[in-house]
Amino acid sequence: MSGHSKWHNIQGRKNAQDAKRGKVFQKISRELYMAVKAGGPDPDSNAQLRLVMDKAKAANMPKDNIKRAVDKGSGSGAENYEEVTYEGYGPGGIAVLVHALTDNKNRTAAAVRSAFTHHGGALAATGAVSYMFDRKGYIVISREDLDTDEDTMLMDVLDAGGDDLQSSDEAFEIYTDPKQLAAVRDALEANGYKLETAELTMIPENLTDVPADKVEKLQHMIDELEDNDDVSEVYEAANYPD
């Protein structure tokens, strides 16, 4: 995991994501719905629901929208979303993992396949690239106005049950066992830290350098995938040139 900064990629696309806020709310609503269906509507006893609710609040999703999604998940509505994972290679041979929540797998598969092929990539068989990624809990703490050095932060992370810490001038990035994410988050917050994000994610074990002439194509492919209403997350094992 050394040298890989998920936060750098997040910040690089932040403005574009802000412009898609309506789509972000729609996707979070589906995640809330699925979390409630799986574990009930009480965030105190449903750790996944609490994580998604925190994600919704961080995205400035209105409370009414959150409540509607939770209420819908608590009922017996007609929606029947399924979690689906697609694997493939983007331009330059970059491994890409796509997670989706869909009520129509045929529609979603066709759209994802089109995004790959349209930009010079290709879908692959199940298992082709998923082994290249590890499921991790991921927490970010901004260093702006934070008077804590890296050694102190590392001790606090380990005491909280975290596995690894990466630091940059802008932020501390913390990685955890996925099952311990909620506990680590709670411990850090109890210690007075303000978290920018706390989520489950997929971290590539190794990054592949993106050829300069493929950067734009790969980014356009990722954008098209993220624009799809059914797609919840896109992960790429990409090392972009400076």
Curated annotation (Swiss-Prot):
GO terms for cellular component: cytosol. Residues 1-21 are annotated as: Disordered. GO terms for molecular function: DNA binding. The keyword Nuclease does not apply. The keyword Heme does not apply. Transmembrane segments: none annotated. Pfam families: TACO1_YebC_N, Transcrip_reg. GO terms for biological process: regulation of DNA-templated transcription. Disulfide bonds: none annotated. It comes from the Bacteria. Signal peptide: none annotated. Keywords: Cytoplasm, DNA-binding, Transcription, Transcription regulation. Gene3D superfamilies: 1.10.10.200, 3.30.70.980. It is found in: Cytoplasm. Belongs to the TACO1 family. NCBIfam families: PRK00110.1 (NF001030), PRK12378.1 (NF009044), YebC/PmpR family DNA-binding transcriptional regulator (TIGR01033). This is Probable transcriptional regulatory protein lp_2253. It comes from Lactiplantibacillus plantarum (strain ATCC BAA-793 / NCIMB 8826 / WCFS1) (Lactobacillus plantarum).
